[in-house]
Amino acid sequence: MKKDKKYQIEAIKNKDKTLFIVYATDIYSPSEFFSKIESDLKKKKSKGDVFFDLIIPNGGKKDRYVYTSFNGEKFSSYTLNKVTKTDEYNDLSELSASFFKKNFDKINVNLLSKATSFALKKGIPI
């Protein structure tokens, strides 16, 4: 992943469907890049739920995960819904912890507290 890329997409196969996580890696929200993200997802030739991890642009856990669906061509809605289920949040947090630990040197942590930055660097789910 290039340092100047504002987001990274991870595709996870879950039984018969695909789950996508779009990690914001800079202070910009991925919603600013919806058309580019749609184009990137279309290249993956799959459809599924798309979760956005906004810990970097939000500066913390508040409203960290939001989601929509992708039908293989475009987002089903440009209105993002908050993840409110605890189990779903915890599962996403585990996946995110692994991603940020592996890619810590490529993210912008300027908006994060030292504690949050440390947790991401060490791969601790938060």
From Swiss-Prot:
This plasmid is only found in Sakai-derived strains of E.coli O157. This is Antitoxin LsoB. The gene is lsoB. The keyword rRNA processing does not apply. Antitoxin component of a type II toxin-antitoxin (TA) system. A labile antitoxin (half-life of 5.9 minutes) that inhibits the endonuclease activity of cognate toxin LsoA but not that of non-cognate toxin RnlA. Coiled coil: none annotated. Can form a complex with cognate toxin LsoA. Keywords: Plasmid, Toxin-antitoxin system. It comes from the Bacteria.
